[in-house]
Amino acid sequence: MMHLLFVALLFLPAMARAAACCGGGLPVPALVLGDEKANLSSTFSYATVGTDVNAEGIWKHRQITEQAQTLRMDSAHVIADRFQAGASVPIVRRARNEDTRTGLGDVALNAGYEFLPEWDYSPWKPRGLSYIQLTLPTGRSIYEASDVNQLDNTGRGFWALGAGAAFTKIRGPYDGVLLVDLHRSFGREVRGTPAGDLQISPGWGGTLTLGAGRSFKDVRVGGSLAWIYEDATQVSGGSLPDGALSRYASAALSLIYSPTPDWSASVAYTDQSLFGAPTNTPLARGVTVSYQRRFPR
């Protein structure tokens, strides 16, 4: 069962970046990826942001770093045969110097279908789960932020609809994971900002993640690399210019301990400054601690 928690850990680089600035890709989907009937997960992440990359790809190190902490609760449940549903709720705390803000992040609801079940052993066929996800604008967007350092920006703040798939494969002590998602964020009007009344129009985004690991009895060691992309945001009706497309790559190393099939605990390190050619994004480094409880069918 250790590889199942690792699948969730693959999304944490994006989550760390989302907490540290203004949102990345879709929130972490709450999924049942094993043979259990339901699971409940609790994740705490701590990230620091010390570098910004502008639209031309030029890096600038911050004189004062920002700290972001996220406490996230996830639950997923099989509702009928190969169908399932899940939800995730994040609480975000951001700090810079003595200034601190805490608020609700973007809540996500998702439904999944296991389109490639693993009923018979195959040396090559993976297990496949597709999902759709609805993201609610419960977090405060960067355009609504009133704090001078924009620390009260706790999410993207847009309705978003996405679809994705997770493929997992185990061969002996080794496992591999492929994750893909595509999502569309929908525009909204933001009134009463210092720049005037704004019409904000985001676009498409996507994530591609590859991961692999090896198990040693009750312990699993793994790594992953994720590529995240977001379209430029169009802004009209005020004095703000349009945004620019955002992209970055995030690496993660994880250690998972699972003494029984019913629960797992993990620690992971994520770094967004090691790979790729980032554009228009802050870069974060962070540590994440997770616990997952699984309930058998």
Regions found by a protein language model. Give the residues of each.
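Residues that define the transmembrane beta-barrel architecture of outer-membrane proteins
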Residues: 36, 67-71, 102-107, 126, ...
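Short glycine/proline- and aromatic-enriched beta-strand/turn motifs that initiate or cap beta-hairpins
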Residues: 18-69, 137-141, 272, 296
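Long, hydrophobic/aromatic-enriched structural stretches that serve as scaffold segments
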Residues: 64-114
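Outer-membrane beta-barrel pore domains and translocons
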Residues: 43-47, 90-92, 114, 133-137, ...
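Outer-membrane pore/translocation modules
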Residues: 99-202
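Short loop/turn motifs that connect adjacent beta-strands in outer-membrane beta-barrel proteins
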Residues: 29-37, 82, 117-128, 172-175, ...
